[in-house]
């Protein structure tokens, strides 16, 4: 560089254009810019080029300093000082006339010359700064400024870069450069800002602390501009510019930024706000890099992206999300194009191939990313490399899933267009399912639907060409066809069944299967390998539905609609549809049982027992006139042949039961007579179809009981004036009853229980009236026996009812006596001797109450006796209560009564009731005998002595007297003295005053 060119000039405008050349006659000024607010964005000059800055000019002594080089300036300074000293000395000598005056003049003018020399040298840093400013302003690109250029200027003027003025100019240049490099708020970072700033800072030789101070000052300017902006939009732009400054500055200074850039302290921002600024700008910068790469990924670009991520200070998680989002958007572009073609109304056949082509691009792109994911140097590649997914994007919505299904269906159709599924296509379908995010069931449903159609088409072709029929192994042929289409053999079997069913429905369209139909079905079954079980199920369902419809039509008209034409149609259907008798009867049974249930519902909803029985009679008539004929026609039996009704036999266990014979003795003859009459009329009924599995046994028994009650009571006719007349019972009702039992599917035991229950109910009502007082006399026994025979109840059940009634009455009386306290142990033992079961009549709690009352009576009897065997053994045995629990009751009562007896004895003593005193003391001794006690305490010992004296006079036994002495705590000497002076003690006791 030629230092002679470093001359201050304000005649050359400065522009940020290509680097200057020393030989150029025209130089441009260096212009810098700060981010503008929104109010300045409307000005083209503010957005396209920074405002011009005027050059700096030298004034006064600065011009002289600029003319002199550093040595010349120093020499000039020396000359000035020396000249001033010499002039001062000369003037002092001339005017002062003495040596001292000469020296004074030399000092004075020397000082002035030194000041002038100092001023000349002090202006050098400012002159150097102005020349540096004007020199840089002449560059089109200030980044070409080097450290050597700055040193040349500094050396020319003999200044240091640390001089305040020179250093301030360097910082201003750096500030303008940083402000020009960082784009304004509305623009995004390009990614080269950090390198430019770092290189320029190095060129200037600026230390990190000084450079950091410049960054903070730029931040203050942006912060002030944000506060000065009046609109919200401008504030947002300034905030974004401030965020970019934070992001770029943190990268420029690296780890040192934590203490060199005090954003939080100076600008009162939080740590999270700083992190957000760094994160958002890093994301935008990395996203712009991804956008520039596009879909042309290779190993080198992925490595570059990884390096870019590191330079951007972007976390792996965010980089991974951005990469996946970029890949998803690329795939979404292909999907949108494919959907546009697929949904186009003017789409032609070539359009389908274009749709498939777009999907192939998606699959190829996905395969490319998967291959990079499996790379050995995956850590050196960009984060997020892997399978593409549409989750979180435009097509991750319920309303978009149908569009993806359309594309998936189109690709499946294309994959099967050749009549087979290639392995690579099958694998691609799985990848496409994962990319689209389709569920397993959704994808399988689409694949199954199209594969079924293709399989059915190829199956039809093989059948038409005879290829399948000529195959040696039809199962192997079909299996091979499934393998070519990747079709599940189980689904193929279901399709075969569907085809067979369709063929069967075509064959039975006219209501019967001809021999030709049977042969065709057999041939189809063999070719399709349809199992016999499946064939039977299909026949049972399809033919069964036809037969069921005919049966329903036959029975819908009721008892009068089953005519010859109906019979003919039933026979034709039963035999023409090739149904087995069991299958046909099973189908007919369902329809018939529904009609039975209808009659049952009507019977239940009827108001009275008679109306309910009439509905049941309709049920019986329907069974006789319709169901029986229907069963005959299904079985193929001739209606002209009389069908002898089988002899009704009851089950063996009932037939051998004595009670059963006694129960139906009176009804058997009527029943048999009615059956014979029915057989003479040639009317038979069938019990082939019953309600055994349709109604609970209890409900069926109730229906039977309803009709049985009707048979016993007969019809009731109401005539005017509220009079009811019972019609004479008809024997045929019992035949209907027998048929109803068969229709209901009741066993002989259940029927027997119903009959016996009614008999017991009738006998119980009459017996309760007769035994109202609970007394069973001989006359009443005879009367009850007569009633038993009339009703037909066995002796065993009659005795149980009688015993139950008498026992209930007696139990109520005994319970009342116990509650009122009128029942003692003597009476209880008399009842037990009379074989009265007290355990069932009297509850355990009441028996325990009796025991407690009995023990209480013993402790209050005044005898002073307690029989342990009686209380602990005999009484609990008679009452059938727990002995250990009884002992506990005795102990509790004895302990309570013991102290109470002493208190009662003292009270009676104070009342001078000597007899009562002896009575209470005997109770005390009885309680003590049951539960031995310690010596009792009493506050007034004289009263205890009086009690002993009074008891002594009652002439007790020595054992009782000795025990009482112990309980009252009277020693032997006192007892002897009391015996000797009993008369005087009594007289003294009469004179005492008792305070109550």
Swiss-Prot record:
Residues 93-100, 263-349, 632-702 are chloroplast intermembrane. Residues 1-57 are annotated as: Disordered. Contains at least one interchain redox-active disulfide bond. The keyword Transit peptide applies. InterPro entries: TIC110. It holds the Pfam family Tic110. It comes from the Eukaryota. Keywords: Chloroplast, Disulfide bond, Membrane, Plastid, Plastid inner membrane, Protein transport, Transit peptide, Transmembrane, Transmembrane helix, Transport. Belongs to the chloroplast envelope anion channel-forming Tic110 (TC 1.A.18) family. Involved in protein precursor import into chloroplasts. Forms a voltage-dependent cation-selective channel at the inner envelope of chloroplasts, which specifically responds to a transit peptide. Calcium acts as an effector of gating and selectivity. Part of the Tic complex. Interacts with TIC32, HSP93 and CPN60. Interacts with the Toc complex components TOC75 and TOC159. Binds specifically chloroplast pre-proteins. This is Protein TIC110, chloroplastic. It comes from Pisum sativum (Garden pea).
């Amino acid at each position: 560089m030629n230092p002679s060119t470093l001359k201050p000039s304000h005649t050359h405008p400065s522009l940020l254009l290509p680097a200057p050349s020393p030989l150029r006659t025209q130089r441009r000024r260096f212009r810098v810019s700060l981010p503008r607010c929104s109010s300045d964005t409307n000005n083209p000059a503010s957005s396209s080029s920074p405002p011009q800055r005027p050059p700096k000019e030298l004034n006064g002594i600065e011009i002289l300093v600029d003319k002199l080089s550093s040595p010349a300036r120093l020499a000039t300074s020396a000359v000035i000082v020396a000249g001033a000293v010499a002039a001062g000395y000369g003037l002092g000598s001339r005017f002062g006339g003495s040596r001292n005056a000469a020296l004074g003049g030399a000092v004075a003018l020397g000082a002035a010359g030194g000041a002038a020399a100092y001023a000349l040298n002090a202006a050098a840093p400012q002159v150097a700064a102005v020349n540096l400013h004007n020199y840089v302003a002449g560059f089109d690109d200030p980044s070409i400024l080097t450290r050597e250029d700055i040193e040349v200027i500094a050396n020319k003027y003999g200044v240091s870069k640390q001089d305040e003025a020179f250093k301030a100019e360097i910082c201003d240049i750096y500030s303008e450069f940083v402000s020009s490099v960082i784009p304004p708020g509305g623009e995004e970072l390009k990614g080269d800002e950090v390198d430019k700033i770092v290189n320029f800072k190095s060129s200037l030789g600026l230390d990190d602390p000084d450079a950091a101070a410049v960054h903070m000052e730029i931040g203050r300017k942006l912060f002030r501009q944000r506060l000065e902006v009046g609109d919200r939009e401008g504030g947002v732009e300034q905030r974004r510019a401030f965020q970019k400054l934070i992001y770029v500055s943190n990268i420029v200074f690296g780890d040192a930024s934590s203490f060199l850039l005090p954003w939080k302290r100076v600008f009162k921002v939080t740590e999270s706000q700083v992190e957000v600024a760094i994160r958002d700008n890093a994301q935008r910068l990395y996203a712009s890099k991804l956008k520039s790469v596009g879909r042309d990924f290779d190993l080198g670009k992925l490595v570059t992206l990884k390096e870019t991520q590191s330079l951007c200070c972007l976390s792996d998680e965010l980089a991974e999300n951005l990469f996946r989002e970029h890949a998803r958007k690329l795939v979404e572009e292909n999907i949108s194009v494919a959907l546009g073609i697929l949904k186009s109304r003017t789409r032609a056949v070539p359009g389908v191939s274009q749709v498939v082509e777009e999907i192939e691009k998606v699959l190829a792109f996905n395969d490319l990313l998967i291959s990079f994911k499996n790379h050995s140097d995956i850590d050196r590649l960009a984060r997020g490399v892997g399978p593409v997914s549409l989750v979180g994007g435009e097509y991750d919505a319920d309303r978009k899933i149908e569009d993806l299904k359309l594309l998936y269906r189109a690709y499946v159709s294309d994959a099967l267009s050749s009549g087979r599924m290639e392995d690579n296509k099958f694998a691609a379908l799985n990848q496409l399912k994962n990319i689209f995010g389709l569920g397993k069931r959704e994808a399988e449903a689409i694949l199954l639907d199209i594969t079924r159609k293709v399989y059915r088409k190829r199956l039809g072709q093989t059948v038409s060409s005879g290829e399948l029929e000529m195959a040696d192994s039809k199962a192997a042929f079909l299996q091979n066809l499934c393998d070519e289409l990747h079709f599940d053999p189980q689904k193929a079997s279901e399709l075969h069944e569907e085809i067979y069913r369709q063929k069967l429905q075509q064959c039975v369209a006219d209501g019967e299967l001809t021999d030709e139909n049977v042969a065709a079905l057999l041939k189809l079954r063999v070719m399709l390998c349809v199992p016999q079980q499946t064939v039977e199920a299909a026949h049972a369902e399809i033919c069964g539905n036809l037969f069921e419809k005919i049966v329903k039509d036959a029975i819908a008209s009721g008892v009068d609609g089953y005519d010859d034409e109906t019979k003919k149609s039933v026979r034709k259907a039963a035999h023409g549809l090739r149904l087995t008798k069991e299958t046909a009867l099973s189908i007919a049974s369902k329809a018939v049982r529904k009609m039975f249930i209808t009659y049952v519902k009507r019977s239940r909803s009827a108001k009275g027992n008679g109306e309910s029985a009439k509905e049941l009679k309709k049920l019986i008539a329907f069974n006789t006139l319709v169901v029986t004929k229907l069963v005959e026609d299904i079985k193929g039996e001739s209606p002209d042949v009389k069908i002898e009704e089988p002899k009704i036999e009851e089950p063996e266990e009932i037939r051998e039961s004595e009670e059963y014979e006694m129960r139906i003795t009176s009804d058997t003859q009527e029943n048999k007579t009615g059956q014979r009459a029915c057989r003479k009329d040639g009317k038979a009924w069938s019990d082939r179809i019953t309600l055994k599995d349709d109604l609970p046994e209890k409900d069926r028994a109730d229906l039977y009981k309803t009709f049985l009650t009707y048979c016993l009571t007969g019809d009731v006719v109401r005539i005017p004036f509220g009079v009811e007349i019972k019609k004479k019972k008809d024997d045929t009702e019992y035949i209907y009853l027998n048929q109803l039992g068969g229709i209901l599917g009741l066993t002989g035991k259940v029927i027997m229980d119903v009959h016996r229950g009614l008999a017991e109910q009738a006998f119980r009502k009459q017996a309760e009236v007769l035994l109202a007082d609970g007394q069973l006399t001989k006359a009443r026994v005879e009367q009850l026996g007569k009633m038993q025979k009339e009703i037909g109840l066995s002796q065993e059940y009659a005795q149980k009812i009688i015993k139950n009634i008498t026992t209930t009455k007696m139990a109520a009386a005994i319970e009342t006596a116990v509650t009122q306290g009128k029942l003692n142990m003597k009476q209880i033992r008399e009842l037990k001797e009379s074989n009265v079961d007290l355990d069932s009549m009297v509850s355990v709690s009441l028996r325990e109450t009796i025991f407690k009352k009995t023990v209480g009576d013993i402790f209050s009897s005044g005898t002073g006796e307690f029989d342990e065997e009686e209380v602990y053994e005999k009484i609990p045995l008679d009452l059938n209560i727990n002995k250990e629990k009884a002992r506990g009751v005795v102990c509790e009562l004895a302990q309570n009564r013991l102290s109470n007896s002493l208190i009662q004895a003292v009270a009676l003593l104070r009342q001078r009731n000597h007899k009562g005193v002896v009575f209470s003391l005997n109770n005390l001794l009885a309680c003590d005998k049951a539960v031995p006690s310690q010596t009792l305490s009493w506050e007034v010992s004289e009263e205890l002595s009086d009690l002993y004296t009074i008891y002594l006079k009652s002439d007790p036994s020595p054992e009782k007297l000795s025990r009482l002495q112990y309980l009252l705590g009277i020693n032997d000497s006192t007892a002897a003295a009391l015996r000797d002076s009993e008369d005087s003690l009594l007289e003294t006791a009469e004179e005492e005053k008792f305070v109550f």
